[in-house]
Regions:
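Active-site beta->alpha loop and helix N-cap motifs at the rims of alpha/beta catalytic domains
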Residues: 2-145, 303
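Short glycine-rich loop/turn motifs that provide flexible caps or phosphate-binding loops at active sites
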Residues: 5, 39, 44-47, 79, ...
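Single-residue recognition of alpha-helix capping/boundary positions
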Residues: 25, 57, 151-152, 232, ...
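A general structural signal for well-ordered alpha-helical segments in protein cores
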Residues: 26, 58, 62, 87, ...
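Structured C-terminal cap/extension of enzyme domains
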Residues: 35, 199-305
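Alpha-helical structural signal in soluble globular domains
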Residues: 36, 60, 64-68, 93-97, ...
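Short secondary-structure capping/turn micro-motifs that flank functional sites
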Residues: 49-50, 110-111, 172, 198, ...
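Catalytic alpha/beta core domains of metabolic enzymes, predominantly
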Residues: 126-132, 140-244, 250-251
Length: 305
């Protein structure tokens, strides 16, 4: 099964002022991401407010991204849901429209507390798109599924034919690497922590990843990998440190989903506000965030159109 090389973006979902999905900016969005070195998108996930979307909206978004994706640009559809039946339907739809792959995080309710529960969840969803690679999206901070991922790999190995790997969005670089080493790298371990790309590269990982701050800082995150491959460790270190400074700023403004989405407006692509229950930024907060970003010369270095 093909492994992803390079960084995939987790895009935000554009909304109109009235809260309806705005499909119009997606073409320009896709072109901008490709221009800045991103290799594809992982849509309708946490950054995309997937759990705040209806099933119809999720399918329409998948169709729109497929329509506008540049040649060779991978579209991976997050199909996770609290309803496995809905997830399987979304998986079937993703395969039907020609998506490159699918993924699913564990549901926030009911909380998954055992490996077998998680395996069964993944198994049923993956069966909805048997011809597509399936990635489990490990983000336990969102759903409380603090389960050992090495045990998940052992459990799915030979049981789920299209299980491709894990989008690993957790703080344990040790566990990430142990998963990467399982059976000499059998599974595709996509790095999901933009703040630790460089240390993961140092262990031999992070050849592929899915990021959230890639939306506006992808050019620098891609640069970390490029500098590492070129043997320019100092450049890679400087880019990683800068990227952490950007993350420090968004952490002051409710993180990437809220603060990061507002950054898109500041760099020229207004994607609207977040859906309830997210607390949107005020104009005053936006001004403060902009000043903090200017202080680190972000706008001279960010993604460009």
């Amino acid at each position: 099964m093909e492994k992803i090389i390079g960084l995939i973006d987790a895009p935000f979902t554009p909304f109109y002022e009235n809260g309806e999905v705005n499909y119009e900016p997606i073409e320009a969005y896709a072109k901008m991401l490709a221009k800045n070195g991103l290799k594809g998108v992982f849509i309708n996930g946490s950054s995309g407010e997937g759990y705040m979307l209806t099933e119809e909206e999720r399918m329409k978004l998948a169709e729109r991204w497929m329509e506008v994706a540049p040649e060779g640009f991978k579209v991976i559809v997050h199909v996770g849901s609290c309803c496995v039946k809905a997830s399987k339907m979304l998986a079937e739809h993703a395969q039907k429209i020609g998506a490159w792959g699918i993924g699913a995080m564990a549901p926030p309710f009911p909380k998954v507390g055992r490996i077998e529960e998680l395996v069964k969840y993944c198994e049923e969803i993956a069966a909805g798109a048997p011809n597509l690679p399936f990635y489990y999206y490990h983000i336990p901070a969102f759903n409380g599924a603090f389960l050992p991922m090495t045990e998940l790999l052992k459990a799915v190995d030979g049981r789920i034919p299209n299980f491709a790997g894990i989008k690993y969005t957790y703080e344990s670089i040790y566990e990430y690497n142990q998963c990467r080493l399982y059976k000499n790298g059998k599974f595709d371990m996509l790095h999901g922590q933009d703040e630790t790309i460089l240390p993961s590269l140092a262990m031999g990982g992070a050849q592929g990843g899915i990021g959230g701050t890639t939306n506006y800082n992808g050019i620098n995150l891609v640069g970390i990998i490029d500098a590492w491959k070129a043997g320019d460790i100092e450049k890679a270190r400087e880019l990683q440190n800068f990227s952490q400074e950007v993350i420090n700023v968004i952490c002051h403004y409710r993180g990437n989903i809220v603060g990061g989405k507002r950054i898109m407006k500041l760099i020229g692509l207004d994607l609207g506000k977040n859906r309830t229950p997210f607390q949107n930024m005020t104009d005053e907060e936006e001004a403060r965030m902009k000043a903090e970003l200017e202080a680190i010369n972000f706008f001279e270095r960010c993604n460009n159109f």
